[in-house]
């Protein structure tokens, strides 16, 4: 079993009155994901952002649940 942990930052924006997740950005570490998520929210003006990790086993196609590292601003219910 080969498990790979991915660290991701993802922006969230208001679209037609509801919050929607944007394009996820892969990051090299948990700290980088948190820093990128904070920048997406604070500097680039997204409604919110989230940093999370996910462990995946590509050999069997198993995607484990996301582990939220940090949230900024408004995010989708999936990341609360």
Predicted segments — roles?
Residues 1-21:
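Short aromatic-glycine-(Arg/Gly/Cys) micro-motifs in beta-strand/loop hairpins
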Residues 11-12, 37-39, 56:
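Intrinsically disordered, low-complexity boundary segments flanking structured domains
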Residues 23-25:
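Beta-strand-rich interaction surfaces with strong enrichment in secreted/lumenal proteins
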Residues 27-48:
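A short, charged, amphipathic alpha-helix used as a generic interaction element across diverse proteins
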Residues 41-80:
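Short, mixed-charge low-complexity intrinsically disordered segments
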């Amino acid at each position: 079993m080969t498990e790979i942990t991915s660290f991701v930052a993802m922006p969230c924006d208001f679209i037609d009155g509801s919050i929607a997740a944007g394009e996820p950005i892969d990051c090299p570490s948990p700290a980088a994901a948190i820093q990128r998520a904070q920048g997406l929210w604070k500097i680039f003006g997204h409604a919110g952002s989230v940093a999370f990790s996910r462990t995946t086993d590509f050999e069997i196609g198993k995607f484990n649940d996301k582990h939220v590292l940090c949230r900024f601003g408004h995010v989708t219910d999936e990341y609360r």
